[in-house]
Amino acid sequence: KGFLVAQVEQELSNLGYSDAEVQGGGLKVITTLDKNMQDAAVATAQKYTEEAATKAKPQQDASQLHVAISSVDTATGGVLAMYGGPDYTTNSRNWSTTPRPAASTFKSFATVAGLRNGYSLDSTLKGDTFTPRGEGVPVRNEFSEQYGDVTLRKAVAESINTAFVDMTESMNNGPAAVIKAANDAGAPTGAGWDANNRIALGAAEVSPLNMANAYASLADSGKRKETHFVAKVLDRNGNTVYEAKNEATQAIEENVAANVTDALTSVVEEGTGAKASQLNRPVAGKTGTNGVDDTITSAWFVGYTRQISTAVMYVAGDSGNENLDAYKKPGDKTFFGSGYPLTTWVEYMQTATKGQEVKQFDKAKPIQGKSIAPSESPSPSVQPSQSQSAHPSPSGQPTEESSAEGRRPTSEPTDSGRGTPSTQ
C-alpha cells in the first residue's frame, strides 16, 4: 500500500494541499483505484516473480527480479491498479514509475508516424537484413530472419525490426515523427530517445505507467488524458472540494488510432501476443524484449481492451538494468516479452475485465498508402504523398539491437527463440 499512498500524497501536494491538510485536515480522498484490480495486480506480480525465480535453472533470487503492472482507465486516465514492488519500506523504488527501455512496444508509435506520413497497413517494407543509407551497421531481425518484403501490418504482428527502420528512414524527418507520435500518445521524452532511424526499436525509456497511458490513447480514439489517482476530495463536512476533470486532448487522429489498434489486434490474433486472445474479447497489444549485446535488460507486454490499458514490465537487479536471462522459462532461449510479461498481463486482465461489457474497438477506415521499394533498392520507388527525403543517419550508431519476439508458428503459440543479437 505504501507505493499507492505515496502516489496519492504526491498528487494532493501537486493539487495544492499542504502536508497538514493531507495528514490531519479531515479530508476524505476518493481514489480511482479499483480494489479487485489492485489485489489482482499484487497477487499476479508476486506469483510470477516467485515462479520465475524458483523455476530458473539454477534457481535465482526473487528479490532481484522486478515486476511492474500499471493499469489505466482508457476513458478517464484514472489509475485502476499499480504494482511497483513488494515492500515500500525496504525498497521505495516504484518500478511502475521507473522508465526503462520500451523495446518493441515503441513500434506502435512508429506505426502512428507512418500512417500520418503516407503509409498504410498494406504498404510494403523491407523484411530482410539491410544497411540504411550512410550507416555501416546492418539492421537485422530476430535470428537474422529474412521475411522478404512485408506489409506494415505484418511488420507489427511479427515485430520485424528491418521494416520499421526502413519506414522511419524513408519518412521526412522520420525519427522526429516517431518521437512526436510517442509524445502525442502520452509517452514523455527521456533517456535513450536519440533521434535516429532505429528509434522504433525501443532503446527509448518509458515508465510502465506512462506506457499504459500512451496505449490508452490508442484505445480511446486517439484521446490523451493525464493519469491520476485522486478522483475526488471531500472536506470534513462531506462537501466536494476537488473533483478530477478527466479532460481529454485529441492528440492522435481518430482514424490513425483506429488503424494502429487494428494492427495491434493482429499481434494478438496471429502474432507474438497470441496468448492475450484468452480474454475472449477484443484485445490489442504489443510484446517487447530489449537486448544489449547478450543481455536482456527489459521485457514487456502492453495491451488494452476498449476500457482498460495495462502495461507489464520485467527488469532485474538493483538498477533494473541487469540480465533477465537468468530468469528465463526452462526451455526458452531467452527471457521474452511473450513469456512471463504476457502471461502476467493475461492473468491480471482476466480479473480486471471480469463482468465488464465486451466493447468493440473503433472500426478502422482504410488509409491509402504508398510502398517502399523492394529490398534490393536503397530508396523508395514510390514516394508517399508528402515530399520525403531520407533522414540523415546519426553520427553514432546505437550499440543495441532491440529484439523482436520472433515468428509465431501457425500452430499453438510458443515463446519463440532469440538469436544472438548482432551489434557491430
Residue ranges and their predicted role:
Residues 20, 52-63, 193:
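Short helix/loop segment immediately N-terminal to the Walker
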Residues 31-59, 69-71, 82-83, 88-101, ...:
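A penicillin-recognizing enzyme superfamily signal
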Residues 65-66, 89-109, 117, 121-127, ...:
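Short active-site loop at a secondary-structure junction
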Residues 119-178, 224, 236-266:
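Conserved catalytic neighborhood of penicillin-recognizing serine enzymes
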